[in-house]
């Protein structure tokens, strides 16, 4: 799984599953066309729309130094009716 890091399970993403929309975090350097092609090829589904937004990294303190976690991109993938993606594993914390 090159482009997709992990699935996102929030209240909104669970609500969107009823509309056949799947939410996941992807690598920040990935483009929409790369992710669309990868999802269609790997899962054998038909993607009709993709929405994405970039989320900023969070501030983290490491001793006296303030740092940041990496920025990441979140994609909401809409599939044609009749197609579905099996649940992706949840990221372990």
Swiss-Prot record:
Domain of life assignment: Eukaryota
Disulfide bonds: none
Gene Ontology CC, one term: ribosome
Database matches in SUPFAM superfamilies: Ribosomal proteins S24e, L23 and L15e (SSF54189)
Intracellular or extracellular location(s): Plastid, Chloroplast
Ranges in a coiled coil: none
A matching Pfam family: Ribosomal_L23
Molecular function via GO: mRNA binding; rRNA binding; structural constituent of ribosome
Gene Ontology biological process terms from the UniProt entry: translation
Keywords: Chloroplast, Plastid, Ribonucleoprotein, Ribosomal protein, RNA-binding, rRNA-binding
Main location: plastid
Family classification: Belongs to the universal ribosomal protein uL23 family.
Record's subunit section: Part of the 50S ribosomal subunit.
Its job: Binds to 23S rRNA.
Name assigned to this protein: Large ribosomal subunit protein uL23cz/uL23cy
Source organism (scientific name): Helianthus annuus
